[in-house]
Amino acid sequence: MVPKLFTSQICLLLLLGLLGVEGSLHAAPQKFTRAQWFSIQHIQTTPLRCTNAMRAINKYQHRCKNQNTFLHTTFAAVVNVCGNTNITCPRNASLNNCHHSRVQVPLTYCNLTGPPTITNCVYSSTQANMFYVVACDNRDQRDPPQYPVVPVHLDTTI
C-alpha cells in the first residue's frame, strides 16, 4: 500500500507542477498589465517577419513561444470589440468575458519551426483575413484611463 500511495503523491506533485508551469506561461511579465502584454503579443499594425516579431515576446518569457497570432490592427480597434456582446470563450468555456469581432482583420500566424533555442527561435508565417475572439476585463490602474475595458487574451481566430 505504501508504494502505491507514494507513487500517487509523486504523480500529483508532477501534475501540479505542470499546471503551475502552464499557468505561468500565460501570465504577463510583472512589469506589464495584462492589456499591455496583450498588445505586445498580438497587436502589430505593420506586419513583420515572424522570427523578428517574436523576439520581443520571447525576450520577456525567456523561451521560444510555440505559436502566436498577430492582429494587424490597432489597440483601439480591439478595445472597440470589447464593447460587442459578451459570449462564452470558445477555447475556455468557464469564461464568459469574450467578444467576437464584427469584421475580419489581416493577421499573421507564427509557428515555431525548428528546435527551440532561446538565442535562435525560427518561425514560419501564414497570413490570413479572419474574425477573432478576445477576452476583455476592466482596466488595470496602469492602463490608459480612456479605456475602461481592455483586451487581455486572444482566445481564437475564426
UniProtKB/Swiss-Prot annotation:
Compartments, record wording: Lysosome; Cytoplasmic granule
Q: Which residues are glycosylated?
A: 86, 92, 111
**Cystine pairs:** 50-110, 64-121, 82-136, 89-98
What's its EC?
4.6.1.18
The protein's annotated catalytic reaction(s) are:
an [RNA] containing cytidine + H2O = an [RNA]-3'-cytidine-3'-phosphate + a 5'-hydroxy-ribonucleotide-3'-[RNA]; an [RNA] containing uridine + H2O = an [RNA]-3'-uridine-3'-phosphate + a 5'-hydroxy-ribonucleotide-3'-[RNA]
Q: Which Gene Ontology molecular-function terms are recorded?
A: lyase activity; nucleic acid binding; ribonuclease A activity
Q: Where is the active site?
A: 42 (proton acceptor), 153 (proton donor)
Q: How does it assemble?
A: Interacts with and forms a tight 1:1 complex with RNH1. Dimerization of two such complexes may occur.
Function per UniProt: This is a non-secretory ribonuclease. It is a pyrimidine specific nuclease with a slight preference for U. Cytotoxin and helminthotoxin. Possesses a wide variety of biological activities.
The protein here is known as: Non-secretory ribonuclease
